[in-house]
């Protein structure tokens, strides 16, 4: 639903009110900004509005100044000429001069809307008459509103064909508060004798919706914008009216009053209304008003008294012919409007096809781009494959060259080996007699070797015999050594006893003078000193006697043995003792050498031990350091995990625990063997 407000336009009372709507010279110059800058839908709506204009406004009396100059004269059969431009048609001409944004001043049309040249005229009209531009066929396609985006998102088509009437909703609101025409305070039913004449004039002068001068800017979306309303000084202010889309229920009419003369008659209040249903206007009201009852067509003109409808005279043939011509002209205009709407629909379809073509071109460009990208990828892959094949070919060529070189080298080696084999065969042929000679020599040597083996066996038997003799002698030597060792032990014991006896004897000899001097110094009883002396002498004598007896016995035994052995035994013993002493010295030297070797081995072993211990210490220290580093890393990982996963506060640097380091004593104890 859209709402309209009509504003009154006051005209000069001295002028004809209908001439106020005639185009001024200034109006034909610059284009109407509403038409020039409006949307394409406004132009389409204007074109359809002009095409559906009714012919009711072309009728009127010829006697009064305020009536339209019409083709009805005295009713003679002379050829009727088209009247000049009606005010509404002139206004439509002024508005349609800039239809679709272009001034087509050189185009002229006849009564039926056919386009003629600028100098030529129609056969049924005068040479200077031109049809209003709203009845012409546009030479250029209408400019449609550019819609961005996809076409399938549009809720409504751009141009609706005018051949189909939209469905009228049941709850639509008609246009209200339309003021009746000015009747100078007298109701329409209570007028004077000219009331019927005024009613006929009113029915004949009704204009359809979409008269000239109206402006539509809906662009096919049901909106009404700035519809100017023309009214004379005799019309009243029209209240705001609300209209349903594509329907106009009432059109402002103008009546001519029945006064004295044409100047006293009232002017018509002409209003132009426009709908907002894709620029379509209904012409049924105009056609119905123009096709009124026959009694209306033959009514008198001027200020005569009105007659009832039953007493009206039948219409004249000229009026019927004019009415039929007007109906024919209206139908032709409807056909032209349908043709224009069809062209506009074709333009819309062309635009749709153009947009689809653009979409297809975009898709084709995308497909080309994708195909070009895929072709580039395939080309790159083919190039990489070609490069890989070239590299493989180069490698195979290099391998082939290497194999050829290796084959040539093997051929040279084969030739060299063949030469060596030939030389070896020649040498073998030369060595055959020498080999035979060496075989005979080998046989001779084998005999000699067997003989030598026999001699070796004999010598081995002699050696074994000698060895057995040596073993016997060694056993005898052991026995002699054992007896000599016993003798030496006895001699040593005798020497020890002799030395001890001699020492005791010397001690006794040293004590004897002191003991002898003691009795002389002290007067004693001759019996007591003798007893003490006897006891002392007895003790000393016992000791001396025992020592002397032992020494004498030993000397006697030694002397006896020495004398018994004789000088030969002594010499042999001395030789044996010298030999034994030499063996003992050699044994001592061997023992010293063995001790020195043992000491050297011990020293080397100690050095190796120290080295091993040092290595173990270093290895253990490295293990300990590795363990400490692992503990530090684990602690850092735990701290990082705690800082990232939980919100536990990290310990401060001063509160961190020191890493465990083993002491030197623990290291030494752990490395001891």
Curated annotation (Swiss-Prot):
Naturally occurring in which organism (per UniProt): Homo sapiens
Protein name stated in the entry: Leucine zipper putative tumor suppressor 3
Its job: May be involved in promoting the maturation of dendritic spines, probably via regulating SIPA1L1 levels at the postsynaptic density of synapses.
Chain intervals with Polar residues compositional bias: 173-186
Annotated positions of the Phosphoserine modification: 316, 318
Gene Ontology CC entries for this record: cytoplasm; cytoskeleton; dendritic spine; postsynaptic density; synapse
Record bears the keyword Plastid: no
Keywords linked to the UniProt accession: Cell projection, Coiled coil, Cytoplasm, Cytoskeleton, Phosphoprotein, Synapse
PANTHER family referenced in this protein's UniProt entry, alphabetically: ZIPPER PUTATIVE TUMOR SUPPRESSOR 2 HOMOLOG-LIKE PROTEIN-RELATED (PTHR19354), ZIPPER PUTATIVE TUMOR SUPPRESSOR 3-RELATED (PTHR19354:SF6)
Upper classification of the organism: Eukaryota, Metazoa, Chordata, Craniata, Vertebrata
């Amino acid at each position: 639903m859209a709402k309209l407000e009509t504003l009154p336009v006051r005209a000069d009372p001295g002028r004809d009110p209908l001439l106020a709507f005639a185009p001024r010279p200034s109006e034909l110059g610059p284009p109407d900004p509403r038409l020039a800058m409006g949307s394409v839908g406004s132009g389409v709506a204007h074109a359809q509005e002009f095409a559906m204009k009714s012919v009711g406004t072309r009728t009127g009396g010829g006697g009064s100044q305020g009536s339209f100059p019409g083709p009805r004269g005295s009713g003679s059969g002379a050829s009727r000429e088209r009247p000049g431009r009606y005010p509404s048609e002139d206004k439509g001409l002024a508005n349609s001069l800039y239809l679709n944004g272009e001034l087509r001043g050189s185009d002229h049309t006849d009564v039926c809307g056919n386009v003629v040249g600028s100098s030529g005229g129609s056969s049924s009209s005068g040479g200077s008459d031109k049809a209003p531009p709203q009845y012409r066929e546009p030479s250029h396609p209408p400019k449609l509103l550019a819609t961005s985006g996809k076409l399938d998102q549009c809720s409504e088509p751009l141009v609706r064909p005018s051949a189909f009437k939209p469905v009228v909703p049941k709850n639509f609101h008609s246009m209200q508060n339309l003021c009746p025409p000015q009747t100078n305070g007298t109701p329409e039913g209570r007028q004077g004798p000219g009331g019927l004449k005024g009613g006929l004039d009113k029915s004949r002068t009704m204009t359809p919706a979409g008269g000239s001068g109206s402006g539509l800017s809906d662009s096919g979306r049901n909106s009404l914008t700035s519809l100017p309303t023309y009214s004379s000084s005799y019309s009243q202010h029209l209240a705001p009216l609300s209209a349903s889309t594509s329907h106009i229920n009432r059109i402002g009419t103008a009546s001519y009053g029945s006064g004295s003369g044409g100047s006293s008659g009232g002017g018509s209040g002409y209003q132009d209304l426009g709908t907002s249903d894709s620029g379509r206007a209904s012409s049924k009201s105009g056609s119905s008003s123009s096709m009124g009852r026959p009694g209306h067509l033959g009514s008198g003109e001027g200020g005569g008294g009105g007659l009832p409808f039953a007493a009206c005279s039948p219409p004249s043939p000229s009026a019927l012919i004019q009415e039929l011509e007007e109906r024919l002209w209206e139908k032709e205009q409807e056909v032209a409007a349908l043709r224009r709407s069809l062209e506009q629909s074709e333009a819309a379809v062309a635009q749709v096809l153009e947009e689809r073509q653009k979409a297809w071109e975009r898709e084709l460009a995308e497909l080309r781009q994708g195909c070009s990208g895929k072709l580039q990828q395939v080309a790159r892959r083919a190039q990489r494959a070609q490069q890989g094949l070239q590299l493989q070919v180069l490698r195979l060529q290099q391998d082939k060259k290497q194999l050829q070189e290796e084959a040539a080298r093997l051929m040279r080696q084969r030739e060299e080996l063949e030469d060596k084999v030939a030389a070896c065969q020649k040498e073998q042929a030369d060595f055959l007699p020498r080999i035979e000679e060496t075989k005979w020599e080998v046989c001779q040597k084998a005999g000699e070797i067997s003989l030598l083996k026999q001699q070796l066996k004999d010598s081995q038997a002699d050696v074994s015999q000698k060895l057995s003799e040596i073993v016997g002698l060694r056993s005898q030597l052991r026995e002699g050594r054992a007896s000599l060792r016993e003798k030496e032990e006895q001699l040593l014991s005798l020497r020890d006893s002799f030395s001890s006896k001699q020492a005791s004897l010397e001690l006794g000899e040293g004590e004897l003078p002191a003991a002898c001097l003691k009795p002389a110094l002290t007067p004693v009883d001759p019996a007591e000193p003798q007893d003490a002396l006897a006891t002392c002498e007895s003790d000393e004598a016992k000791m001396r006697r025992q020592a002397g007896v032992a020494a004498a016995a030993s000397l006697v035994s030694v002397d006896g043995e020495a004398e018994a052995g004789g000088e030969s035994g002594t010499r042999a013993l001395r030789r044996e003792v010298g030999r034994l002493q030499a063996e003992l010295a050699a044994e001592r030297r061997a023992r010293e050498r063995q001790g020195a070797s043992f000491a050297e081995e011990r020293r080397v072993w100690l050095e190796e031990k120290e080295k091993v211990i040092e290595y173990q210490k270093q290895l253990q220290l490295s293990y300990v350091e590795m363990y400490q580093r692992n503990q530090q890393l684990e602690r850092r990982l735990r701290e990082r995990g705690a800082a990232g996963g939980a919100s536990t506060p990290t310990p401060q640097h001063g509160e961190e625990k020191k890493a465990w380091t083993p002491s030197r004593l623990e290291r030494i104890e752990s490395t001891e063997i």
